Amino acid sequence: MTRNRKRLAVIAGGMGFILTAVLLVMFAFSQSVAYFYMPADLAKTPVAPETRIRLGGLVGEGSVVRGTGSTVEFAVTDGSTNPVKVKYTGILPDLFRGGQGVVTEDMFAAGTNVFVADTVLAKHDETYMPKDVADRLKSQGLWKEGQGQEAQGKQAQGQEVKATP
């Protein structure tokens, strides 16, 4: 083998290795990415059953029904006419209650309109919510300022206060 052929073989092997690595990373990301939806989004563009997504909004007031064991059913709403029924088995976060912001993650059960969640995250303010989602909830009048957070103008815990002379 000549020197040029060896160099070409090394370059081709390196390119093949890089291509394989990129394809493996893309496959891994496609398996772990979960797109964020709100109930109004799901009404416009339904998601195929068994597609992993994140569903966010507010827990419907009076919709929390505790079943046997640690199974809980509740509705997630964003003010649209179609709240989404969610079923979750596990320990709920302390901040979870009706009217509170929530993000659930998993998929719709095949043949039903029930979202079976394996993760439930309770939110107490827009710090943990995408800005556009918080803005949509505020524009619909569903977001209550100061809910779960210190009122504006109060000094946050841990911040230094500078005295003015």
UniProtKB/Swiss-Prot annotation:
Gene Ontology CC annotations of this record: plasma membrane
Lineage, uppermost ranks: Bacteria, Pseudomonadati, Pseudomonadota, Alphaproteobacteria, Hyphomicrobiales
Residues in compartment: Cytoplasmic: 1-7
Reported function: Heme chaperone required for the biogenesis of c-type cytochromes. Transiently binds heme delivered by CcmC and transfers the heme to apo-cytochromes in a process facilitated by CcmF and CcmH.
Keyword Repressor attached: no
Stretches that traverse the bilayer: 8-28
Domain of life where this protein originates: Bacteria
Membrane topology: Single-pass type II membrane protein
InterPro entries with a match to the protein in the record: CcmE, CcmE-like_sf, NA-bd_OB-fold
Region of interest: Disordered: 139-165
UniProt protein name: Cytochrome c-type biogenesis protein CcmE
GO molecular function: heme binding; metal ion binding
Keyword Heme: yes
